[in-house]
Amino acid sequence: MKKKLYIAYGSNLNLNQMKYRCPTAKLVGKGTIENYELQFKGMPNCSYATIAPCIGKSVPVALWELQPRDEKLLDRYEGYPSHYFKQDLPVKLNNGSELTAMVYIMNLKQDFGLPSASYYDTVLQGYKDCGFDMKVLNEAVNDSAEKYYENLEQNNLFDSPDEDMGMGGMSL
């Protein structure tokens, strides 16, 4: 059986979740993916973590060793290949070494949005489990929310305040 190295950056940082999802997976290291940023995409109030290229940014990650069965289970949980695709990326480990491992990345056609409270809490616990700086997670949520609302404004999906007040566009 060939083992595979897997990069986690979202809810699969959560140790209890990974223990449940992939009972034979082993946490083997922590590090960063350089020149990528964490984002939340999907539905407006039910978005999930993904990563995207962004020069100068980095994403903290956990490195898991997966058995073939673990990978099949993760494929199902991650909605591979319809929701996420797989890619091999370099990881800079905290000990200074670098290696390449598999990561799930959301299909690019998804819009920015906000994570549900329960999903955010799961990712937050993962950040705590791994000892990561919460700043990256909170910036990702804020940036994704900002882009979501910008998209609404650009597409004129907000009603004007006058219409909301039932004044037929008249100002008082």
Residue ranges of predicted features:
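Glycine-aromatic micro-motifs
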Residues: 1-172
